Amino acid sequence: MDINLIKQYINSSLPNDKESLIQYYGQLKQILNALSDKEQQQLLNNNGKISEQQQLSIENNYKVIGSIEEKMKSIEHLFNNLDVSDSNNNNSTSPVFISLDNQNTVNNNNNNNNNNNNNNNNNNNNNNNSLAPTVILDNNDNKKTAEIILPDHHNNTPQQQPEQQVQQQQVQQQQQVQQQQQQPEQQQQHLTEEQIQKQQQSQASIQQAIANMGEKKRSSSRHSGPPEIPPEEIKFDVKTDLLGGGAYGKVYKATCRGKKVAVKVPKKQTLSESELKSFKNEVEIMKQIFHPNVVLCLGACTKPGKVMIVSELMQTDLEKLIHSSEVEPPPLYERMKMCLDAALGINWLHGICNIIHRDLKLANLMISKDKTVKIGDFGFSQVIKTGTTLSDQKGPKGTALYMAPEVMMKHEFNEKADVYSFGLILYEMATCEELFPEYSEIDPFYDAICNKKLRPPIPDSFPKSLKTLIQKCWDHDPNKRPSFNEVTQRMNEVLTDTAISGLDAAMFWKYNFIKPESESVPWNEFVYKLSSVVNLPTQVLSPLAQLFVSQSYEEEIGGVVTMERFDLMNKWFGNFFNSKYGPAILYEMIELLKKRWFHFDISRDISEKRLRGRPENTFLLRLSANDPIKTPFTISKTKGSKPTHKRVSREDVQINEIKQFPMGYKFTVPLDGNELVFGSITQMVEELHRIGNLSIPCPITEIKVPYLTD
C-alpha cells in the first residue's frame, strides 16, 4: 500500500453528506486493518528481527495508524453526540450509534480506579479494540440511511432488550458522552497551542460535515454495502433509454427514487451459483470505492430475472468523445487532463483498494457533465494482495486490444497489467486514432504483441515527456513499467509540455511551479517568481494581473495563473520571463494596460459590436487568437461606417538590431501598399494616430444601432 497516498486521504477534507462520510469511515477502517496486518506479517516473516530501515518504515506506518484511529474516533464521538441529542428530542428507546471510543473511556476509568485488576481491564480493552464499529445501510420508507454500530459484546444473535435495560444503557451512554466532553479539557492542559488549534480545526470540519447531513430516519437493519433496491423502483424504457451495451448486457438511463441514474442489466438474468457470485463480486468491489475519479455505485438488485447494478449517471465515455465522426475531439491539453483523471482513479484502485481493473479501455472511462473522467465497469476487476500475482487458468479476461502480453499468454500478472492498458489509452487519446486497425484476427495479433513485441508508432511531434511515458507504460517487461503513483507524477510534466508550446516557457514553468496538480499557480506566487527572474519589483508588475489572471478565477483571493493562460501570454508577448528581454516586454505590457484603445483578447464579433455607430477611424487594438505567435495583435477600426480589421505581425530580430528593437522583436503593419515597421505596439499606434490613420479610441461599451440586416 502507498503510504503517501494514504496520508493524502487521511488529511483530505471530510465529505459533506452523510452517505459519503459513512463510506469514508469504512474506507479508513479497511486501511487500518490492512496496515495492521502488514506490520504483523512483516514481524512474523523476520521472526521479530528487523533491519534499521524496516524499523523506520514500521514506525512511519504506526504514525499513520495512529492518525487513522484518531480521525475515526473523532467521527464516532460526533455521531454519538448527534444521536444522543436526537434520542432526547424524539424519545427514542434504542441507541443507534454506539461509539467504540465510549467503551474505551469507561474501561480506562476502571483501570485508573482499580489498580489490582489491571490485567483484566487491559484484556477488556484489547477485546473492545478488536470489535470495530460496523457501517450499515438500509432502505426503509424509500429513504437510504446509514449508521455506525458496534458488534454485540455478549450475544452472537440480535435480540430485544427489556425496556429497563434499554433505559439503563441510555443513561450510561449519556454519562460516557459527558466524560468524553470533560476529557479533552483535561488533556488540553498538556497540549501546545498549535496542537490545540489543529484539534479544534479538525473538530470544526467534522462538525460542519455533520451539520450538512440533514435529518434522516435511522434504522437498525444490518445490511452492508450499497442497498438492495427493489426492481419496481428502477424505472426505464428499454426502447428509448438505451445508453450502450456489449457482450455482458446493456446499460440504460433510468430513474430511481427521483434521481437520474445508470442501470447495468446483464444479458443473462437467470444466474447460476457461480455467475451470481461473480455478479455480487462486482457489486462488492464497487461498494468499497469512494473517489471523485471512480463511478459511484448506488445500489443493486439481485432478484432473479431483475438483476441490475445502479450507479451514478455519466454523460458519455472517452471512446464516443474521441472517435466521434460528428464532433471534433478536444485539444491535446484537454485530452491529457482527461488521462490524468483516469490515472488518479486507477492509482486509487491500486494504492488504497488493492484492486486490479483488468479491462481498462476508452469505453470504460466515463465522462461526467463537468467533464471529469471516472473509471467504470468493474466486471473483470479483482482484489489482489500487495506483492502477489494472479493468473487466468480458464483463459484471459478483458479486451484484447488493450490486454497486456503476460495476460494474453496466460502468465502470472499483477497491477502492472493495468499500466500496460493505460499506455495504449494514452497513445489513443494523444493521436485520436484507433488501435491496431490492421488486425482483425486474434492469432496474428497475438503473435505481433506477444512474440514480435509490436507497438503503435509514436509521432515525432509528441513532447518527449509524453513519448517516454507511453513507452514505459507499454514495456513488454511488467517490472519495467511504472506504478500508477509514478504515472500520475509524470502526467503533470506531460500536462505542462502539452499546455505550454514554447520550450523556454515550459522550462520556466517546470522549474518554478511544477508540482502535483500544478495546472495553475496563485498570482502572488507567480509574480514573485517572475520578479526575481527579471529583477523588477512586484509592485511594478502588479498591474499585469489584469492580463494573467484567468477570467474564471476572479472570485478567488488574488486569482490564479493557469498554464493555458501563461502559454497564451507567451505567444502574444514573447519571452517576458527572459532576464535579457523580459523587462522591456513587461514595461510594454504595463503601458498597454493604461491605454483606452487596448481591449484585451476580445473576439472579432465583440469588437465589431463595440465599433458599430462610431465615427470614422474610431479604433481599438485587441489580442488575436487565430495565430498568436505570427500575428499576435489586430487593429480594428471603422472605415466607411463599417468595421475593418488589420493584423499586426511580429518577427525576431538579428543580434545587431537589438539596440533598435530592445524587446527582441519588430512589429509590421500594412498601410496603403507599404509595410511600416515599429519597435513596440505603443509606438506603432502613436504613429498611426499622428498621421491620421487612427483617430478616436473606442470605448468598451456598445451603441445599439439598428442595421438593415438585423
UniProtKB/Swiss-Prot annotation:
Q: Where is the active site?
A: D359 (proton acceptor)
Disulfide bond positions: none
Localization: Membrane
Residue positions binding ATP: L243, G244, G245, G246, A247, Y248, G249, K250, V251, K264
Q: Where is the composition biased (Low complexity)?
A: 83-94, 107-129, 197-208
Record carries keyword Nucleotide-binding: yes
Spans annotated as Disordered: 83-136, 189-232
Which CDD domains has this protein been placed in? SH2_ShkD_ShkE, STKc_MAP3K-like
Instruction: Keywords in alphabetical order, please.
Output: ATP-binding, Kinase, Membrane, Nucleotide-binding, Serine/threonine-protein kinase, Transferase, Tyrosine-protein kinase
SH2 domain span: 597-707
Q: Name one GO cellular component term.
A: cytoplasm
Cited InterPro entries: Kinase-like_dom_sf, Prot_kinase_dom, Protein_kinase_ATP_BS, Ser-Thr/Tyr_kinase_cat_dom, Ser/Thr_kinase_AS, Ser/Thr_Kinases-Pseudokinases, SH2, SH2_dom_sf
Domain called Protein kinase: residue spans: 237-495
Q: Which family does the UniProt entry place this protein in?
A: Belongs to the protein kinase superfamily. Ser/Thr protein kinase family. SH2 domain-containing protein kinase subfamily.
Q: What is this protein called?
A: Dual specificity protein kinase shkE
Q: Which organism is it from?
A: Dictyostelium discoideum (Social amoeba)
- The gene from which this protein is expressed is shkE
